[in-house]
């Protein structure tokens, strides 16, 4: 059984101000390699022969340039064909629109995941599912204590027990606000009395699906409106169909797999997650890091750090647990700890940075002290500035561009809260039971806002 891959590259609104029209999310560097590189390498290790990279029309040119001049030029084997396709719209309609390009069963991937879970494990899980399983989704639990829990916001995932030989997805709901009620259908509980509601499972947005899913009929006949939705909503509707119809025993199902605790998995959907992904790569031995070739004129570069080509550091500068890009210039007595510094950054003398992310081409003048800050590309931090936990950004023409029509996939941060009401029209009120929200582990009362 062979597979094709579709990699979705959203705009990355949660990664502002690091992203820009010139530096889309998929090209943000992680350990001095574009984010997209890791998704492509995962596909390469899976032995896939065909990959379609989907992005917004505004990001098509820089991503195509990277594929042609960057990724392809580094590959000794040309066995995997990579094609870039622009699409502005929902991910459900995107998958349907790619029907002519999808010749095999397919794997849907985000561009922003970092994991040591072997791709063969994911493929084998799907291959071993019962025949009626039309697709398999991957979920994971956050294993990083340093992650900002407020940015995770998992949905309510209803499924058969994970301990079952073949766990099955039954439904997905946006996580409710505190004290809100969750409506659970009686028809589902009659058929699956051991159904479990999970509040800690996070969607990886990795799905393995049979090609026949592209012809799935939701009961509307022909081109159903249900395809004009985010992909997560399409998957949810297929899962619901498996139990809410009279002949549910014959319906297609969606399998589930939860990443084991011994494996790491992270998605770069926020600035804090992006910082952790860089640290995770430094710890993992499964990825080959580029060589450190900085000119260190008496500077101390820790073995737990990575420094790009052409970077120059003056005496008494210290770099620990940090990743520094190419062609940077660091003055005397600079101190970096736990930072990500992108290409072309200039640091004056005596600059101290702790747990910061510094964008491309930033200039930080003498004796500045930044702790936990994110600095937009090309920004100038004035001499002796002292900032803590701030976002430093300017107001450039790039920042004022309207990107509201860009392709936005739920692999980034899409909410389908409004669609639940539309999909419930055919369900009788007597088929619903209510679960009080106070019985659910809720972190805050603004959980429907995923922006």
Regions found by a protein language model. Give the residues of each.
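Eukaryotic complex-assembly/interaction regions
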Residues: 71, 75-83, 136-141, 221-223, ...
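Left-handed beta-helix
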Residues: 223-451
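Short phosphate-binding loop-to-helix
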Residues: 58-108, 115-117
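Hydrophobic residues within beta-strands of alpha/beta enzymes
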Residues: 51-53, 106, 136
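N-terminal glycine-rich phosphate-binding loop and ensuing alpha1 helix
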Residues: 1-72, 119-125
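Catalytic-core segments of class I nucleotidyltransferases/pyrophosphorylases
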Residues: 106-107, 114-115, 120-131, 144-287
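Short beta-strand/turn micro-motifs composed of small residues
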Residues: 9, 55, 110, 137-140
């Amino acid at each position: 059984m062979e597979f094709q891959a579709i990699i979705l590259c959203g705009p990355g609104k949660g990664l502002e101000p690091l992203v820009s029209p010139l530096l889309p999310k998929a090209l943000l560097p992680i350990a001095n390699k574009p984010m997209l590189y890791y998704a492509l390498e995962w596909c390469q290790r899976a032995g896939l022969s065909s990959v379609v990279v989907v992005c917004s029309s505004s990001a098509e040119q820089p991503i195509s340039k990277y594929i042609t001049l960057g990724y392809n030029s580094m590959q000794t084997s040309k066995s995997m064909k990579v094609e870039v396709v622009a699409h502005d719209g929902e991910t459900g309609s995107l998958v349907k629109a790619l029907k002519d390009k999808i010749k095999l069963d397919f794997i849907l991937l985000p561009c922003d995941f970092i994991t040591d879970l072997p791709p063969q494990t994911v493929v084998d899980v799907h291959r071993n599912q019962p025949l009626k399983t039309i697709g398999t989704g991957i979920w994971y639990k956050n294993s990083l204590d340093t992650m900002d829990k407020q940015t995770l916001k998992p949905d309510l995932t209803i499924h058969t027990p994970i301990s079952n030989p073949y766990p099955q997805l039954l439904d997905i709901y946006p996580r409710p606000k505190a004290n809100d009620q969750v409506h659970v259908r009686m028809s589902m509980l009659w058929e699956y009395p051991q159904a479990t509601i999970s509040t800690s499972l996070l969607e990886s947005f990795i799905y393995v699906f049979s090609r026949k899913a592209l012809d799935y009929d939701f009961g509307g006949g022909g081109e159903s409106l249900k395809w004009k939705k985010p992909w997560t909503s399409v998957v949810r509707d297929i899962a619901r169909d498996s139990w809410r119809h009279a002949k549910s025993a014959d319906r297609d199902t969606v399998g589930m797999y939860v990443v084991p605790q011994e494996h790491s998995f992270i998605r770069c959907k926020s600035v804090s997650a992006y910082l952790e992904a860089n640290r995770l790569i430094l710890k993992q031995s499964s990825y080959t890091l580029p060589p450190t070739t900085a000119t260190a004129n008496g500077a101390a570069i820790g073995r737990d750090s990575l420094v790009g080509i052409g970077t120059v550091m003056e005496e008494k500068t210290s770099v620990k647990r940090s990743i520094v890009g190419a062609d940077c210039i660091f003055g005397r007595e600079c101190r970096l700890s736990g930072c990500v510094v992108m290409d072309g950054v200039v640091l004056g003398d005596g600059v101290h940075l702790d747990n910061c992310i510094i964008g491309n081409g930033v200039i930080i003048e003498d004796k500045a002290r930044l702790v936990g800050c994110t600095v937009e590309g090309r920004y100038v931090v004035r001499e002796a500035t002292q900032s803590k936990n701030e976002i430093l950004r300017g107001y450039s023409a790039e920042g004022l561009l309207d990107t509201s029509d860009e392709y936005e996939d739920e692999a980034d941060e899409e909410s389908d809260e409004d669609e639940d009401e539309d999909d419930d029209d055919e369900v009788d009120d007597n088929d619903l039971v209510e679960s009080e929200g106070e019985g659910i582990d809720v972190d805050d009362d603004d959980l429907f806002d995923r922006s």
